[in-house]
């Protein structure tokens, strides 16, 4: 089977790390072992520096919403062009912790940045490049934030209000409802059930690719 780009999405505390482990185990059970992992923002030296600025800020300077989204897209295009596309070209599968859907949901939904600007940024920076499959881990923000807080110190974005994450989730769900490549997983279930749901969805998707 040709190499594919699979992305895991969701709010803070949705369980993306566990989901990644499930995706990898499922792929390997199907004989797919050449797997590259990415995270966004990040994944290249420049993108990691931008990640630190986005997550932590610098010297107390207010990071404007538009500056934030432009930094995210700068980090993203570095990762796509320098890591993801070359990996796919040489036959590796890529499993990503977040991609463009995060910006559409967090900045477009949570921050309220104009949807036309968000679409224009995506199309200008990424062109037609899209993930082959996105697994969106959906859960109420109040649950996700409680999990995130239990992990320890929160970053700049994790400290946003509950209303911010409600808007972000709403945009995630809107986008998932209109894109068949986005599969929604109920991440409020017990962990074992979430992993089973992910594995089933991925197996079905792999089977559909083989018979297409």
UniProtKB/Swiss-Prot annotation:
Annotated protein name in UniProt: Thymidylate kinase
NCBIfam families named among the record's database cross-references: DTMP_kinase (TIGR00041)
GO cellular component: cytosol
CDD domains for this protein: TMPK
Keyword Transmembrane helix recorded: no
Known catalytic reactions: dTMP + ATP = dTDP + ADP
Function field: Phosphorylation of dTMP to form dTDP in both de novo and salvage pathways of dTTP synthesis.
InterPro entries assigned to the protein according to its UniProt record, in alphabetical order: P-loop_NTPase, Thymidylate_kin-like_dom, Thymidylate_kin_CS, Thymidylate_kinase
Family assignment from sequence similarity: Belongs to the thymidylate kinase family.
EC number(s) per entry: 2.7.4.9
One Pfam family linked to the record: Thymidylate_kin
Keyword Transcription regulation among UniProt keywords: no
Residues binding ATP, per UniProt: 10-17
Alphabetically ordered keywords of this record: ATP-binding, Kinase, Nucleotide biosynthesis, Nucleotide-binding, Transferase
PANTHER family noted in UniProt: THYMIDYLATE KINASE, UMP-CMP KINASE 2, MITOCHONDRIAL
Record GO terms (molecular function): ATP binding; dTMP kinase activity
The encoding gene: tmk
Species per Swiss-Prot/TrEMBL record: Yersinia enterocolitica serotype O:8 / biotype 1B (strain NCTC 13174 / 8081)
One of the GO BP terms on file: dTDP biosynthetic process
């Amino acid at each position: 089977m040709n190499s594919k780009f699979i992305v895991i999405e969701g709010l803070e505390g949705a369980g993306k790390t566990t989901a990644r482990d499930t995706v990898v185990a499922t792929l390997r059970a199907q004989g797919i072992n050449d797997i590259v992992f990415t995270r966004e923002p990040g994944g290249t030296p420049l993108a990691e520096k931008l990640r630190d600025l986005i997550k932590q800020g610098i010297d107390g300077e207010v990071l404007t919403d538009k500056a934030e989204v432009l930094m995210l897209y700068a980090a993203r295009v570095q990762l796509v062009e320098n890591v993801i596309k070359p990996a796919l070209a040489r036959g590796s599968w890529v499993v990503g912790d977040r991609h463009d859907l995060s910006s559409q949901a967090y900045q477009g939904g949570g921050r309220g940045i104009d949807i036309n600007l968000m679409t224009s940024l995506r199309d200008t920076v990424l062109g037609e490049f899209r993930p082959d499959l996105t697994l969106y881990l959906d859960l109420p923000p109040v649950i996700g934030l409680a999990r995130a807080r239990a992990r320890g110190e929160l970053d700049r974005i994790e400290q946003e209000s509950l209303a911010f994450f409600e808007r972000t989730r709403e945009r995630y769900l809107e986008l998932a409802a209109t894109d068949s490549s986005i599969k929604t997983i109920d991440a409020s279930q017990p962990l074992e059930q979430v992993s089973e749901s992910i594995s089933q969805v991925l197996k079905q998707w792999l089977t559909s690719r083989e018979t297409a």
